[in-house]
Amino acid sequence: MRAIGLILAGGNTYRMKDLSQKRAIAAMPVAGNYRAIDFALSNMTNSRITKVGVVTQFNAGSLHEHLSSSKWWDFGRKQGGLHVFTPSVTSDNSLWFRGTADSIYQNLSFLKESHEPYVVIASGDGIYKMDYNDLLEFHVDKGADISLVCSELSDPKDCERFGMIKLNDEMQVVDFEEKPIAAKSNLVSCGIYVIRRRLLIELIEKCAEEERFDFVRDIIIRYMNVKKICGYKIKTYWSNIASVEDYYRTNMDFLKKDVRDFFFREYPDIYTKVDDLPPAKYNVGSDVRNSLVASGTIINGIVEGSILFKKVFVGSNCTIKNSIILNDVYIGDNTYIENCIVESGGTILANSYHKGEDGPKVIIEKSDRYVF
């Protein structure tokens, strides 16, 4: 493809609450075996983009570990490959990234040393599958300076959490509102852009000169009436992880057959780092219905409408309903869990009762484990 990729994965949000204490949002576990960033990385390699930069910052340890080998996404190359950028103190700079535009500016050499004419920019917290070649073809056909991907928002109340755009008949962006109370349209910006590399360098350098740091506010919105910015609609599944409720809802969507088939049965595939773990084990007395169960898990109880990630142990006479159990969780006997998200590495003592009443309840239990 005639483009390089740039994934912005350094953000933090208070709406993730306790779930963001261990990891960046881009490293949040999804659908049993995956991380959020896997979807953007897979889209890049499936679109034949062979050179990708990932910008990280907040709580990036888990994300860096996940990206430690680029072979899983076919980026183990002599030319191109996967490049991970973190804030670093230099003679010219002693600050962390102050925004998305600033994070690109502090790694501008990645763009200047590349030769591809276009750049595809994507967020690391979007759950979707698309061919960026279609976006690039649309961008060229429209003669646009910048093209962004948009999707229809099913619930109008969600507009307060996203950037909402309005298009004219020529698919040009005529209005962009950042997190409005009442949106003028139902089109949400997905945080995916294509732009000519030289133009991006020019705009980013101008932002730096004027001490402007945000890509959306200081480039997309500011230049909306100066540059030709077009919107490319996608009609397939798209979700963004920006809150505990988003995270819960997105994972639960994977219990729907059409969503699972779209991501995991239809070409192309979604790739992730593979752990060598044994298959899940269902002991006598277990009963599992409409759930996703990852490798290394042992189940002795009842699991219904839930997602269990890797290395989860469910004790005898346990009931787990409509819940998400993250990696390496031990659940003691006679435990009831419903409408909850159990943080990784947790130990739920026997005879416990947890139920989320108003939305999903986040459980962080750090009791001692005894292995005999």
Predicted segments — roles?
Residues 1-4, 198, 206-372:
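Left-handed beta-helix
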Residues 1-254, 364-365:
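Unchanged
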